[in-house]
Amino acid sequence: MIDFDVEPEFQKQIDWVERFTKDEIEPLDQFMSVGRRKDGSPLDGDSWGVIRRHMSNLKQQVKDQGLWGFHLGPELGGPGLGQVKLCLLNEKLGKTRMGPSLFGCQAPDTGNMELIAHNGTEE
């Protein structure tokens, strides 16, 4: 049987991700799925600029929590959480469209990051 219990400090991170997902990511997902203003008109370049700035702010909040690129091991600048903790975090983010992008763990970047880190050169 797999033990899914985690230490209290990590549970606080899971709880933060759950709140962040509900309060920030789900509304963004809803907006992005429509991609229009309240009056039904399509978004213009200025609107997308506002969205990009908002997403940058959300990414910074994730980084401030130490959860950016949480799938990476410590040798690549990540926390090296292990499979159970990865599963618990991905369970929360997998319910959203934009969550993985905001946490720096979206496909195909997750696999590519490791490949470049292990096989890339300075060039």
For the regions a protein language model found, what residue spans apply to each?
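Amphipathic, small/basic residue-rich leader segments at the start of a protein or domain
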Residues: 1-106, 118
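Short, conserved phosphate-binding/catalytic loop or strand-edge motifs used
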Residues: 106-113
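Short, intrinsically disordered, charge-balanced linker/junction segments flanking boundaries
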Residues: 120-123
